[in-house]
Amino acid sequence: MPAIVIVGAQWGDEGKGKATDLLGGRVDYVVKPNGGNNAGHTVVVGGEKYELKLLPAGILSPNAVPIIGNGCVVNLEALFQEIDGLEARGADTSKLRVSANAHLVAPYHQVLDKVTERFLGSRAIGTTGRGIGPAYMDKVARLGIRVQDVFDASILRQKVEGSLRQKNELLVKVYNRRDIEVDEIVDYFLSFAERLRPLVIDSTYVLNTALDEGKVVLMEGGQATFLDVDHGTYPFVTSSNPTAGGASVGSGIGPTRISRSIGIIKAYTTRVGAGPFPTELFDEMGMYLQKTGGEFGVNTGRPRRCGWYDAVLARHASRVNGFTDYFVTKLDVLTGIEQIPVCVAYDVDGVRHDEMPMTQTEFHHAKPIFEYFEGWTEDITGARTLEDLPENAKNYVLALEKLSGTRFSAIGVGPDRDQTIVVNDLIND
């Protein structure tokens, strides 16, 4: 069987965890190809809410093998805290595996992340302070420490020494902080070696062998399209490529083996942290969406900025990722709103743009051009087919599908796994 990739189509928090959980019972492997414990996601199973950060949502699917891929950066302390938290609630994490080539987040990465944000002041990106950006910087600069290095104390020490030679200069001379001892970091990593060893695999070999054997592999991207370091609203982005192409690189699965690229998109739009957001609401309606949708970050608790659905973004995300399907979430949050605006184009300094503006400056100047749709008041959480939806809700969904340029194959009408309208099978159709 070919592989399937799930990608956030906005700025994150679209409900990728729900989509993964819905499909998890039908797949054999769920791999997280990018990011670290900076991207939280919520999964509701049997009325119980689980807030995951570093672990793939597939950890809660009893039949799937969850894998942290080579494209991730792993905070070992956070990893085992999350595992322990799930096991304390009765979840089975014994199938979890971690790529030997994944990079590690060191304590000094977290220190650098926080002091850099403070140093930038009003120009801060709004990171989670988890050290993800600095860890990816070290990866690209060839100063990174990988999972496999924890099992060779000599190599580990050499790499820590090389990295700290640069980091301590920065910490002491620029940020007026104390230097960090090599032994402190080496001992920190070695303390996890025994527990980590049984989890570590050659993930590229395992996943491709599984595909050769006809198994189904689901790649669960973190963050989202417009946080991608290449395709997002740079510089207000993450440090990896949470797009479909990045999922291929971060899992070691070649692009020709991917059969479905599924975009996860909210029926409205949210964003955490700084950066442009054309449809953002600054009034009571924005507060209403925030409260009704529970729009607060899993990782930081920060309130999410809320706005209307942006079809320009949806079309661009579909183009970048080659989406075959969209999975729309949180349609139920819009229940009770009398009239629902949808952004169909932008006004940039008096010029209409039907597609994403080319430059950062233009996007910062973009003002939404809206079309308006009649709302509904009926409870839709029990709907399981399009025909079950009130006429106005159905019209809204069909309009978004047409404006977004990609078929809507699933629609979330509530937080639970079964509160979903499946229009087209997301694996076999």
From Swiss-Prot:
Principal location class: cytoplasm
Catalytic center residues: 13 (proton acceptor), 41 (proton donor)
Keywords: Cytoplasm, GTP-binding, Ligase, Magnesium, Metal-binding, Nucleotide-binding, Purine biosynthesis
Binding of GTP, residues: 12-18, 40-42, 304, 330-332, 412-414
Coiled coil regions in record: none
InterPro entries assigned: Adenylosuccin_syn_GTP-bd (IPR018220), Adenylosuccin_syn_Lys_AS (IPR033128), Adenylosuccinate_synth_dom1 (IPR042109), Adenylosuccinate_synth_dom2 (IPR042110), Adenylosuccinate_synth_dom3 (IPR042111), Adenylosuccinate_synthetase (IPR001114), P-loop_NTPase (IPR027417)
GO molecular function per UniProt: adenylosuccinate synthase activity; GTP binding; magnesium ion binding
Catalysed transformations (reactions): IMP + L-aspartate + GTP = N(6)-(1,2-dicarboxyethyl)-AMP + GDP + phosphate + 2 H(+)
The record's free-text note on cofactor binding: Binds 1 Mg(2+) ion per subunit.
Enzyme Commission code: 6.3.4.4
Annotated substrate binding sites: 298-304
Binding site for IMP: 13-16, 38-41, 128, 142, 223, 238, 302
Annotated Gene Ontology cellular component terms: cytoplasm
Pathway assigned in UniProt: Purine metabolism; AMP biosynthesis via de novo pathway; AMP from IMP: step 1/2
Cell compartment(s), UniProt: Cytoplasm
Stretches that traverse the bilayer: none
Function in brief: Plays an important role in the de novo pathway of purine nucleotide biosynthesis. Catalyzes the first committed step in the biosynthesis of AMP from IMP.
Subunit organization: Homodimer.
Family: Belongs to the adenylosuccinate synthetase family.
PANTHER family noted in UniProt: ADENYLOSUCCINATE SYNTHETASE (PTHR11846:SF0)
Name of the protein: Adenylosuccinate synthetase
